[in-house]
From Swiss-Prot:
Keywords: ATP-binding, Cytoplasm, Ligase, Nucleotide-binding, Pantothenate biosynthesis. This is Pantothenate synthetase. GO terms for cellular component: cytosol. It comes from Clostridioides difficile (strain 630). GO terms for biological process: pantothenate biosynthetic process. Belongs to the pantothenate synthetase family. The reaction proceeds by a bi uni uni bi ping pong mechanism. The gene is panC. ATP binds at residues 29-36, 146-149, 175, 183-186.
Length: 282
């Protein structure tokens, strides 16, 4: 079922609650791929009803970013969601989601000071606002987010905790192409040559992981190795290479417990992100 109005969706949710159904939510910006499908299928497995939102959120894009060019295909997305087991696809307009004169913002300080938050200053304010709206409208028991957007996942978990929102936030593993490239809607921007060059993200992270497993626990040294590997690809331009505490997302000077190794790289004009977590077993 395709729903575009908040009021109608809320009426559907009320009816589900009357019957005691559990509800799962997957929020997306559309142009769905196997990464999204893995979230939907997990939600379907764990809940009686599943809502998938398909909404390119204008408030999380900064000036000169790709809001207008972001790929959209609601007909294809709707079929993809239904084939994956979703109950409802919620596809509101920006006017439906944001009242004229909207002046409410949500800022999760600290967690957004580094990584993508530092490079895209308006991004997480927009993410938090729209996700809080979806959680308020759908009131899901569980909501599912991909670990590829590791900072987003951490920020949303913190927001939900701080605002006492009664939804369990569940992180789901990164889904990759056979050659290791993390699935992303933005991969469609890549030319054939750029697509090959994009493999440098996973290659550089694999190198870092090997070094960590060997016992190289110097974060600056690991960052240097990643940087050198990425710079060996002429189409790649580094946005950031960071090693941070996996919970606080603060940069670490030494590796003592769980860390997140995260990178953002421009391949041509396309900005791609990737990461992995590493747990030090003492």
């Amino acid at each position: 079922m395709l729903v575009k109005e908040i009021k109608l969706l809320r009426n559907i949710i009320k009816d589900w609650r009357k019957h005691g159904y559990s509800i799962g939510l997957v929020t997306t910006m559309g142009f769905l791929h196997e990464g999204h499908q893995s979230l939907i299928k997990k939600a379907v497995k764990e809940n009686d009803k599943v809502v998938v939102s398909v909404f390119v959120n204008p408030t999380q894009f900064g000036p000169n970013e790709d809001f207008n060019s972001y790929p959209r295909d609601i007909d294809k997305d709707f079929k993809y969601c239904m084939d994956s087991g979703a109950t409802v696809v919620f596809n509101p307009s920006p006017e439906e989601m944001y009242l004229k004169g909207n002046c409410t913002t949500i800022n999760v300080s600290g967690l957004t000071d580094f990584l993508c938050g530092a490079k895209r200053p308006v991004h997480f304010g927009g993410v938090c606002l729209v996700v809080s709206k979806f959680l308020n409208i759908v009131t899901p028991d569980k909501a599912y987010f991909g670990e590829k957007d590791a900072q987003q996942l951490a920020v949303i978990k913190r927001m939900v905790k701080d605002l006492n929102i009664d939804t369990e936030i569940i992180g789901c593993p990164i889904i990759r192409e056979n050659d290791g490239l993390a699935k992303s809607s933005r991969n469609t921007y890549l030319s054939e040559e750029e697509r090959k060059s994009a493999l440098i993200l996973n290659k550089s992270l694999s190198l870092a992981k090997e070094e960590l497993v060997k016992g190289n626990l110097n974060p600056e040294n690991i960052k240097e190795l990643i940087t050198a590997k990425i710079n060996s690809e002429h189409l790649a331009k580094i946005d950031y290479v960071e090693i941070v505490d996996s919970e606080t997302l603060q940069p670490v000077k030494q590796i003592e417990h769980s860390i997140l190794v995260a990178i953002a790289v421009f391949i041509g004009k396309t900005r791609l992100i990737d990461n992995f977590t590493f747990e030090l077993n003492i």
